[in-house]
């Protein structure tokens, strides 16, 4: 650049560390707002910039970690959350997020470790207790899973997923009646909850109450037709025994007709926990 041109260039801003951190936190808030509207592609570069401007702020790293996880970049997410945890070791929410990320990585033992550490700092958080139960469930540690689900339900009586998953455990252990009672309770809490409704339908149908089972199955799939997909059920921790019975149930002409009818229906939005 010739000398004249150089004279026209703006002087670089001399920001002190306090001003940089303030700017970083402001950008992080902007990224968080975008994330609330699920605009992750716009939020992510802002969150990355925020960690550069405010590298000693656990908030910026925690936000970046959560965004990486939302966009399924799990390794980057775990690394960012670990950085946040190093900056604020007593923050239970960061440990809970780490536990959730480890679960998604299928590292269930590490998930248990992170969640237990978080619960020591902040006990009786229903979502964390539920996640801990799920990690035990994936390791086939059923008594421990049920204990955590029961704790979660004790903390929040409307928390039907915990009761639902106790039903999943019951069914895999061959306690069909116990599973039916749990799923009935879950549906009584939320009569729009498609998962326990379909599980209950399958259990009733398999037990011999075919008419009630089919009618309930139709209602469940009308609420949310994703539950007609075996892979989706696996993601929701349905075990082998229940999946086998569900496969037979889904292949019945009446349920096949219901699935075809619902195929054109829009999928319900996924609600944030």
State each model region's role.
Residues 36-46, 70-83, 104-117, 138-151, ...:
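Structural signature of tandem alpha-helical TPR/SEL1-like repeats
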Residues 122-173:
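Ligand/cofactor pocket segment of small-molecule handling proteins
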């Amino acid at each position: 650049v010739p000398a004249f041109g150089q004279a026209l260039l703006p002087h670089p801003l001399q920001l002190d560390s306090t001003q940089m951190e303030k700017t970083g936190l402001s950008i992080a808030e902007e990224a968080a707002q975008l994330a609330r509207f699920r605009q992750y592609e716009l939020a992510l570069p802002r969150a990355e910039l925020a960690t550069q401007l405010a590298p000693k702020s656990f908030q910026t790293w925690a936000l970046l970690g959560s965004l990486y996880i939302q966009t399924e970049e799990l390794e980057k997410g775990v690394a960012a959350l670990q950085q946040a945890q190093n900056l604020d070791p007593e923050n239970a929410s960061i440990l809970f997020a780490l536990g959730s990320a480890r679960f998604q990585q299928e590292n269930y033992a590490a998930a248990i470790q992170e969640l237990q550490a978080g619960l020591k700092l902040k006990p009786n958080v229903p979502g964390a207790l539920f996640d801990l139960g799920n990690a035990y469930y994936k390791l086939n540690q059923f008594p421990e899973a049920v204990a955590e689900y029961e704790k979660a339900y004790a903390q929040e009586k409307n928390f039907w997923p915990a009761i639902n998953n106790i039903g999943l455990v019951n069914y895999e252990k061959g306690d069909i009646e116990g599973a039916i009672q749990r799923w009935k309770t879950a549906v009584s809490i939320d009569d729009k909850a498609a998962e326990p409704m379909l599980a209950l339908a399958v259990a009733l149908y398999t037990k011999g109450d075919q008419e009630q089972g089919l009618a309930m199955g139709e209602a469940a799939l009308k609420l949310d037709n994703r539950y007609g997909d075996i892979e989706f059920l696996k993601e929701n921790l349905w075990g082998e025994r229940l999946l086998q019975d569900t496969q037979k149930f889904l292949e019945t002409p009446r349920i096949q007709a219901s699935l075809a009818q619902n195929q054109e229906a829009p999928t319900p939005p996924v609600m944030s926990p």
